[in-house]
Curated annotation (Swiss-Prot):
Expressed in skin. The gene is Gjb5. Belongs to the connexin family. Beta-type (group I) subfamily. The keyword Transmembrane applies. Residues 41-75, 148-182 are extracellular. SMART domains: CNX, Connexin_CCC. GO terms for biological process: cell-cell signaling; epididymis development; labyrinthine layer morphogenesis; spongiotrophoblast differentiation; trophoblast giant cell differentiation. Its main location: membrane. PROSITE patterns: CONNEXINS_1 (PS00407), CONNEXINS_2 (PS00408). One of its GO terms (cellular component) is connexin complex. This is Gap junction beta-5 protein. Keywords: Cell junction, Cell membrane, Gap junction, Membrane, Transmembrane, Transmembrane helix. It is found in: Cell membrane; Cell junction, Gap junction. It is a multi-pass membrane protein.
Amino acid sequence: MNWSVFEGLLSGVNKYSTAFGRIWLSLVFVFRVLVYLVTAERVWGDDQKDFDCNTRQPGCTNVCYDEFFPVSHVRLWALQLILVTCPSLLVVMHVAYRKAREKKYQQEVGKGYLYPNPGKKRGGLWWTYVCSLLFKATIDIIFLYLFHAFYPRYTLPSMVKCHSAPCPNTVDCFIAKPSEKNIFIVFMLVTAIVCILLNLVELLYLVIKRCSECAPAKRPPTAHAKNDPNWANPSSKEKDFLSSDLIFLGSDTHPPLLPDRPRAHVKKTIL
């Protein structure tokens, strides 16, 4: 896989991301992809070859390795990074689709705009971006669960005991470079959690921003209303109406006064 081309395509999403999205993209490429390419593959390498058990029984080492390492960390991380970065490419492709439609519209009509700004997060593009955030956060959460299912404590011990057939008895198996591997495991887990938080924060930011844009703005008084003397100087009845505690009874009778309360505290009634 050509990672440089993949990175170049994915970096185009920067133009349509918020500050949280740019931080997420930098975190993914600098702290996850580069660490995976430069160090993780070298640390794991031929992990099965370095898995050693104190027995000469043919097939025992392979069976024990498959029992304790059903899926390699490196393979899981590779699949996780591919799935996590794909939604960002969908956003770029959606923008490219809108620009192509805009260009075709200009060629056919010759004036006007199909989209006010093809790269602006509005309409379907906004939903595509929001769905991409949900998808990325969901993928990271699923892979965190998978790591926990395969390796309950996330970290690797230096020695494991195996008693699976065809091993003659319980044998001790030793994992190569356990401390170094645990450092990278914790690092990748922490960066995944940070990416999840960034996705959720960006999603919350976009929803709040959209709600504030859709909320009706308070209109200022018109010039005609300002020139109206009743608007600047309301009558005494209007002041009394606005400042008093009111009870809407919907009847023609006044409410009875309570004997244990003074008349000054009785609420006024609108007939």
